[in-house]
Amino acid sequence: MPRTLSLHEITDLLETDDSIEASAIVIQPPENATAPVSDEESGDEEGGTINNLPGSLLHTAAYLIQDGSDAESDSDDPSYAPKDDSPDEVPSTFTVQQPPPSRRRKMTKILCKWKKADLTVQPVAGRVTAPPNDFFTVMRTPTEILELFLDDEVIELIVKYSNLYACSKGVHLGLTSSEFKCFLGIIFLSGYVSVPRRRMFWEQRTDVHNVLVSAAMRRDRFETIFSNLHVADNANLDPVDKFSKLRPLISKLNERCMKFVPNETYFSFDEFMVPYFGRHGCKQFIRGKPIRFGYKFWCGATCLGYICWFQPYQGKNPNTKHEEYGVGASLVLQFSEALTEAHPGQYHFVFNNFFTSIALLDKLSSMGHQATGTVRKDHIDRVPLESDVALKKKERGTFDYRIDGKGNIVCRWNDNSVVTVASSGAGIHPLCLVSRYSQKLKKKIQVQQPNMIKVYNQFMGGVDRADENIDKYRASIRGKKWYSSPLLFCFELVLQNAWQLHKTYDEKPVDFLEFRRRVVCHYLETHGHPPEPGQKGRPQKRNIDSRYDGINHVIVKQGKQTRCAECHKNTTFRCEKCDVALHVKCSVEYHTE
């Protein structure tokens, strides 16, 4: 019976016979795999060689898969039999047991023929249906635009699950829609009126006291609502979805954001970081970003910053649709399908090198869309472009390009550094000139730029613009629970989207700060409930330094009797500077340290 070859014998064959082309070597676990101590590789963790393999691994039975061989057509016999006409030839497989097939579908690589030619294609038409102008036939206030997203259904969902969660803890919350809007107004106000501690909004000291907040909601009531805020039923959470506590709200806001998308043709897709400094399995660290620690959201947006679609990153995506294209490309395809379903049409998508691949461009083209994006070298195999090193030695503005038979063009352009861009909707021409500063000449010079680079620069920054808008007035009130940061981000996102619609459809738009202030004032003045007469609050704290300075402490008569700050008996006099009730006879003792 033919014997099974070991890993050591197979590697010897590969080293001595150059005619053998192997695509993979599959080995069995070594005999000491379950032993408490096993021999280890002597090489480094990265960049090791075949000479560093341990002896137990070299003597393990293995089989070799040659290029072009079909592993599924092998015989069930675990051994092998050489061919009669060439006994020295290595068979296509040496096997003892085939590994289980991978669950993930893999893309078949198709080699393309590239030639040096420009891409000539007409721009896509954009949306087929008309934009939702019927919602803006009359002038809408900032609050009315915001409530296109935070409508009665969304507010009732938050109120329902917050009351349900409080009830499960034995607390009668009794939250109403009007009270939640007042609560949300305080959250929005903290974005442009920031205090070190949120309780300082309700302090009576004149340096931090906020009349609008303290007159709208009691401090303890705000804390109770914040600690019980929920948007899902904890008894029915999806164990696979790590963001199931937020999923009902995210789904509803995605529907509304997609419903009111402005009539645009170009959409960008990128990541968005939400700051978070606690512990959670989905927390990310991205070096070089303005926000390095926090939750990562995938967002699709217009070039001006209206976010149409967003999903939180949670490692393995529960949605396995299009997973054969990879993590980044599958998300772009999910966004494109959601956009096309809500607004049928043909669009141009722009994204960075995390998402771009030739397979993704082909897939979007088959759906009637176009795309442009920077691309990594390993995502464009065997494109005969000039190397980065060669282009870097040439003058600024030099570029090289190739196009395949399916209408995908790849261009490598030398600017400050060499950048590679792939596109199915923009070519090299018309060339444009851009201004750059030359270190050598010590002046600005004109550099030629391909059209596809211009398209990428013009339409890529939508998500970054939204990030900048939100971060400028991000709510300073934060909770300790892991979901408080992404939950408040959802409210910030729809407020920013409402402002984008206001800019698009209003004849006299205001800036984001003024828009935010109008929403805050409306919510706190309309839905706030001032403290009832007779409610007793904390005693007012006075500045000790001014109390004992001995300057201008004048005792004046007041209209009604109040308690003396020194002897606590009723008096009709008060200190005008300290603003406390005070007998004339108690003034010296009160103002002496």
UniProtKB/Swiss-Prot annotation:
Tissues of expression: Expressed in heart and oocytes, but not in granulosa cells (at protein level).
Modified residues (Phosphoserine): S86
GO-annotated molecular function: sequence-specific DNA binding
Listed GO CC annotations: nucleus
UniProt-listed InterPro entries: PGBD, PiggyBac_TE-derived
Biased composition (Acidic residues): 38-47
Keywords carried by this UniProt record: DNA-binding, Nucleus, Phosphoprotein
Subcellular location: Nucleus
Chain segments carrying region Disordered: 27-53, 69-105
Keyword hit for Glycoprotein: no
Coiled-coil parts of chain: none
Consequence when changing D415G: In a breast cancer sample; somatic mutation
Keyword Nucleus listed: yes
Lineage: superkingdom: Eukaryota
Function description: Binds in vitro to PGBD3-related transposable elements, called MER85s; these non-autonomous 140 bp elements are characterized by the presence of PGBD3 terminal inverted repeats and the absence of internal transposase ORF.
Note from the entry: PGBD3 gene is located within ERCC6 intron 5.
Stated name of the protein: PiggyBac transposable element-derived protein 3
Organism annotation: Homo sapiens
